[in-house]
Amino acid sequence: MSVLSVRDLCKKYDQFELNKVSFELEPGTITGFIGRNGAGKTTTLKSLLNLVHPNSGEIVFFGKSYKENEFEIKQKIGFVAGGIDYYPKKKIKTITSTTRPFYKNWDEKAYKHYMDLFDLDENKTPDELSAGMKVKYSLVLALSHNAELLILDEPTSGLDPVSRDDLLDIFMGLSDEGITILFSTHITSDLDKCADNIIYIKNGKILASTDLTSFLAQYKVLELTDEELTDELKTKLIGCKKSKHGFSALIRATDSEKLDLAMSGADLESIVVRLEKE
């Protein structure tokens, strides 16, 4: 059974439309949710949290309709975002005491375990925490009510490379424990390291929803000289641009099979940047 199933989700605004968004999340997987600003990521996440009311479509968590089981479902969901500002002068233990009553499955033993694991001092205030430690505290709150699904909205934004890598290790460890993660981010290199699956949204439409390996295998990066960039080849290229030694472009793997040219595998950033300019 899927942890989350979204079917034909639509939301209309004056200048933007979320258009029949559909995808599924399988248990214990990390799914990267990518797309440029304004593509529909935030609207989708807010719809999942019932902060935005879609015009049509269906959202099913753990095999149950969201509309009819919202309270029960939210007991199993944790939301973590980068840049969350808690009461800056309140001690962490006070914030925890305020949060605890909202969850019927609050597990004090788990709370203490993750506070120790993440080396957090509950006598400190958010003002005394780094950005990375604030994200870890958000994770503690989510995991202390035994969340089975974590929805992450730019959790590594603004963090230094070491802190980001530390969090990615944590996410992968949680996935190994069976927790499902939906990871919305602009930092595609993070997803290269940890994602099992990718959802790519552009202009309110899902253009890809597949496993990461299959998504990357669909494209190659070509490095071309002026002489190699023929008019016929140009028709097959995606996001061709001038490079240090000639031209660089993306090409679909199916179009590259008979080409005797220098090419390499593509990472997420190479693919998304060029697809956005297509």
Cite the ranges covered by each PLM segment:
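C-terminal coupling/interaction segments
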Residues: L237-E278
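Conserved beta-strand
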Residues: V6-L9, F16-E26, F33, G57
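Catalytic Walker B motif of ABC-type/P-loop ATPase nucleotide-binding domains
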Residues: L150-E154, L159
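Walker A (P-loop) phosphate-binding loop of ABC-type ATPase nucleotide-binding domains
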Residues: G35-G40
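Helix-to-loop junction immediately C-terminal to a conserved catalytic motif
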Residues: L49
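Conserved ABC transporter NBD signature motif
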Residues: L25, G57-E68, E72-I73
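ABC transporter nucleotide-binding domain
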Residues: L167-I251
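ABC-family P-loop ATPase nucleotide-binding domains
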Residues: Q75, F79-Y137
